[in-house]
From Swiss-Prot:
Gene3D superfamilies: VC0467-like, VC0467-like domains. NCBIfam families: PRK00228.1-1. InterPro entries: AlgH-like. Belongs to the UPF0301 (AlgH) family. GO terms for cellular component: cytosol. The gene is yqgE. Pfam families: DUF179. This is UPF0301 protein YqgE.
Length: 187
């Protein structure tokens, strides 16, 4: 089982404060473990434009029609000071890894320098931090019913409102997650 380019959808009973009601996009999954980015947990009061200001990135060819007021996600509990940018191709940046035909993850500053310009990728999600599982750990969590899995959907990843991503990701596999046991007040 390879879950690269899949969503992990937290089961309603999962109460860990970081992963509760989370959707994790799996960037890498192999015999050594897995790595992913939480795509529905916005950091409070932090938007892309704030990251660019903090890093003193002010593109000369800024296009004011391109919005930079999108929320930055808490990508996971590890390396929360490190940026991870999920985006659509191209993958012309210094530190890019193609995850699928339609998704790339980049960790280098050069992708940030394109944000707000005509050179930026068409779809972008910026996160600080990531989630990781050791060898066999994710598989055990799946056996323990902590997660549902679904093939990733770019519309949910990049366009669905953040507050709706958990429910919409579960709908990919025909489940209304709000009616499942463990979701109080929605049965």
């Amino acid at each position: 089982m390879n879950l690269q380019h899949h969503f992990l959808i937290a089961m309603p009973a999962l109460q860990d404060p970081i992963f509760r009601r989370s959707v994790v996009y799996i960037c890498e999954h192999n015999q050594d473990g897995a790595m992913g980015i939480i795509v529905n947990k916005p950091l409070e009061n932090l938007q892309i434009e704030g990251i660019l200001e903090k890093l003193k990135i002010t593109p000369e060819s800024r296009d004011s029609a391109i919005r930079l007021d999108k929320a930055v996600m808490l990508g996971g509990p590890l390396a929360e000071d490190r940026g991870f940018i999920l985006h659509t191709p191209p993958s012309r940046f210094a530190s890019s890894i193609r995850i699928s035909d339609n998704t790339v993850i980049t960790t280098s500053r050069d992708v940030l320098e394109t944000l707000g310009t005509q050179q930026q990728p068409s779809d972008v999600l910026v996160a600080l931090g990531y989630a990781s599982w050791d060898k066999g750990q994710l598989e055990q969590e799946l056996l323990d019913n902590a997660w549902l899995t679904a093939p990733a959907d770019l519309n949910i990843l990049f366009k669905t409102p953040i507050a709706e991503r958990w429910r919409e990701a579960a709908k990919l596999i025909g489940i209304d997650i709000l009616t499942m046991p463990g979701v109080a007040g929605h049965a």
